[in-house]
Amino acid sequence: EKMGWLGIDPSSIRHILITHQDTDHVGAVEADSLGLFRKAKLYVGETENRYLTGEVRRKVIYHLYKLPQVTIRNEKVLLHDGEAFEIDGIRIECFLVPGHTWGHMVYLIDGKYLFTGDTIWLGADGGYSFISALAEDNRLAVRSLAELEAKLEARKLHPMFLTGHTGWTDNFTFAFAHKDKLCSPFKKRVHDPSAPYDAYDESDDTEERSKSGYLKGVGR
């Protein structure tokens, strides 16, 4: 529906970057989906691909539950940490940021736009390591986020951060404000003012706004 707002035909999409294999991120390319993107080539981290081959099972809720294996039949290109390549003149750099999943990949586009998937949760007071109950390894997630910040700082890169669930920000300091803290699903804001909560107001995500090319950021 939302691609239709922009006049984009899903069947015309030829390349899709996969941050990680959770169904809420890859459902539209799963074998039992409607097949909207059946012609697209998928780019996924080599480590993350082990979930897709069945070598590793995805565990959530502090490893209490195993999720069903995700099946994808599209052509895949396996990527590695630090790899850079181009698609139709667009430069893409890969950053391995494990923790939420073992092979979670973050993509920097033309040095300006960082697609962070489920590595950062933008709370109203800044970014946190993503929801603790859904991580394979929370300590690794926190450490990986700090390493990502250091890599970007070392290259003086301050991109726009586009998250998988909590909107976007172009405020570097805000994005990493609480990188050493987990977004806990057990902290309730009504009882705990320090509990992180989603700062992204989805009421802003309308057809009119999308066509104007602007959705409000957070931390600005």
Where are these regions (language model features)?
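Active-site HxH/HxHxD metal-binding segment of metal-dependent hydrolases
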Residues: 1-80, 185-189, 196
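Catalytic core of the metallo-beta-lactamase
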Residues: 1-11, 27-28, 70-127
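Short, flexible active-site-adjacent loop segments at beta-strand->alpha-helix junctions, enriched
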Residues: 22, 46-50, 56-58, 83, ...
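Short, glycine/charged-enriched secondary-structure capping and boundary segments
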Residues: 30-34, 56-59, 112, 128-131, ...
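Short secondary-structure boundary/capping segments
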Residues: 33-34, 84, 106, 152
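Short secondary-structure transition/capping segments
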Residues: 59-70, 94-96, 128, 201-220
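Metallo-beta-lactamase
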Residues: 91-98, 102-174
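Divalent-metal (often Zn2+) His-rich catalytic cores of metallo-beta-lactamase-fold enzymes
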Residues: 123, 143-219
